[in-house]
């Protein structure tokens, strides 16, 4: 079987698009449930929807205009989901919010581009650290939360380090 770079890019973009949409559907339903139960105001849910779905729409437009083999789509995922992830990290009190990045990080391995994965890992780590500083300055953290931040940081480093195996 012969390697075809165009077919590889098409396959990677289609797979990541499917995973990204599924992840956003799950998060949208979860956030809707939390909003209905009074955990978030409706305005926060509207902002969530915008941060969640506008990057997907932009990605779909780019795929339609440039074709599924476009190398730009991976950057749309990284930037679009990165902004959405930052919104979640900064607006939720849950220490588990950092896991929302793990499915996307594992998706990026499909592109088999070590430098790209490392750059995304650095960006994700900056978001987690900035979120921890933000929550600390807002008085939201307890001393036990710092252990959680250490775990988050370690998970992100490990995920980024997996790029060395490419």
Residue ranges and their predicted role:
Residues 1-9:
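Short, Lys/Arg-rich, polar N-terminal cytosolic tail immediately upstream
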Residues 90-95, 112-114:
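Transmembrane helix interruption/hinge and helix-loop junction motifs
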Residues 158-164:
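Conserved small/polar residues in nucleotide/adenosyl-binding loops
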Residues 15-93, 100-106, 120, 124-129:
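Hydrophobic transmembrane alpha-helices and their membrane-interface boundaries in multi-pass
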Residues 8-16:
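Short, Lys/Arg-rich cytosolic juxtamembrane segment immediately N-terminal
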Residues 86-93, 128-154:
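Interfacial aromatic-anchored transmembrane helix boundaries in multi-pass membrane proteins
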């Amino acid at each position: 079987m012969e390697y075809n770079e165009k077919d590889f890019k098409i396959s990677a973009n289609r797979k990541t698009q499917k995973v990204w949409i599924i992840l956003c559907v799950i998060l949208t339903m979860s956030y809707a449930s939390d909003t209905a139960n009074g955990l978030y105001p409706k305005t926060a849910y509207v902002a969530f929807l915008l941060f969640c779905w506008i990057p997907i729409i932009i990605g779909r437009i780019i795929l339609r205009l440039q074709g599924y083999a476009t190398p730009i789509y991976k950057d749309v995922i990284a930037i679009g989901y990165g902004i959405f992830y930052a919104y979640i990290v900064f607006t939720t009190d849950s220490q588990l919010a950092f896991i929302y990045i793990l499915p996307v990080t594992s998706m990026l391995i499909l592109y088999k581009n070590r430098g790209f994965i490392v750059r995304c890992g650095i960006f994700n780590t900056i978001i987690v650290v900035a979120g921890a500083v933000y929550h600390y300055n807002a008085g939201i953290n307890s001393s036990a939360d710092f252990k959680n931040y250490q775990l988050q940081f370690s998970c992100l480093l490990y995920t980024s380090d997996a790029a060395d195996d490419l």
